[in-house]
């Protein structure tokens, strides 16, 4: 057995037990290298922050510190005042801008001179519905906008083919102008009423002795139906005339017999129960009241 003896003397015990083990065991190196110039301890950063009066847990090295300074610290004024003087030569304003401001002033002045000499028909909804059922046509709403009059008309849907016109005069019916009304699609379908809209231009100047009046014409099934404000026509007058009329009445509203019939209906009507007898609940005529739109 000379060979076995020689190998046991030559090999150490560790190499004999683990022949695949590395002969040299070196420690592993970290893969991230830290910059020596940027190594600042947390305690030093915290002390420096507390010294500067800033409560910061982390400071970025190399970043410039921000400073805030005001103008008065440097001997300057906090505000700057500029004074504009009048020009010796007039400013050259473009014609379109000059016309825009001039027309705006004219419109505002003319708008104040004209006013509606009637109440909105739809203000009394029950009477408004009754007029549509009886006369099949009624002015719903009207307003003055700049130098024009616009509004809406409600008609009873008797036939598909129909025509609605606005007949207006600016000189007390010496002559008149017809304006075709446009159909307006209702939001809610299934109603037996149709809505039409109109818009008519007003003259720049109206003589004080002349009146602006209009009426609504409804043509359907070969018949011509009119809404002329129950024979009085719808009038547009100067605001000064309406003010003088109110002052002559002593500031009190005049009521006719028809007006009293409107406000004093039979007991149980919606207006009477809400006005004179609010504690009387009643549903008389409630089934005849439909949606208002």
Swiss-Prot record:
Q: Which UniProt keywords apply?
A: Carbohydrate metabolism, Glycogen metabolism
One GO term of the biological process aspect? regulation of glycogen catabolic process
What would be one Gene Ontology cellular-component term for the protein?
Answer: protein phosphatase type 1 complex
Report disulfide bridges, numbered on this chain.
none
Q: Does the keyword Iron-sulfur apply?
A: no
From the UniProt record, list the coiled-coil ranges. Answer: none
Question: Has the keyword Phosphoprotein been applied to this entry?
Answer: no
Record's Pfam families? CBM_21 (PF03370)
CDD domains for this protein: PBD_PPP1R3B (cd22814)
Instruction: Please list the residue ranges annotated as the CBM21 domain.
Output: 129-237
One GO MF term on file is: protein phosphatase 1 binding
Write down the PROSITE patterns for this protein, in alphabetical order.
CBM21
* UniProt function note: Acts as a glycogen-targeting subunit for phosphatase PP1. Facilitates interaction of the PP1 with enzymes of the glycogen metabolism and regulates its activity. Suppresses the rate at which PP1 dephosphorylates (inactivates) glycogen phosphorylase and enhances the rate at which it activates glycogen synthase and therefore limits glycogen breakdown.
Can you quote the domain comment? The N-terminal region is required for binding to PP1, the central region is required for binding to glycogen and the C-terminal region is required for binding to glycogen phosphorylase, glycogen synthase and phosphorylase kinase.
The record's listing under PANTHER family reads: PROTEIN PHOSPHATASE 1 REGULATORY SUBUNIT, PROTEIN PHOSPHATASE 1 REGULATORY SUBUNIT 3B
Describe, as the record does, how this protein assembles with itself and its partners: Interacts with glycogen, PPP1CC catalytic subunit of PP1 and PYGL. Associates with glycogen particles. Forms complexes with debranching enzyme, glycogen phosphorylase, glycogen synthase and phosphorylase kinase which is necessary for its regulation of PP1 activity.
Q: What is this protein called?
A: Protein phosphatase 1 regulatory subunit 3B
Record the organism: Danio rerio (Zebrafish)
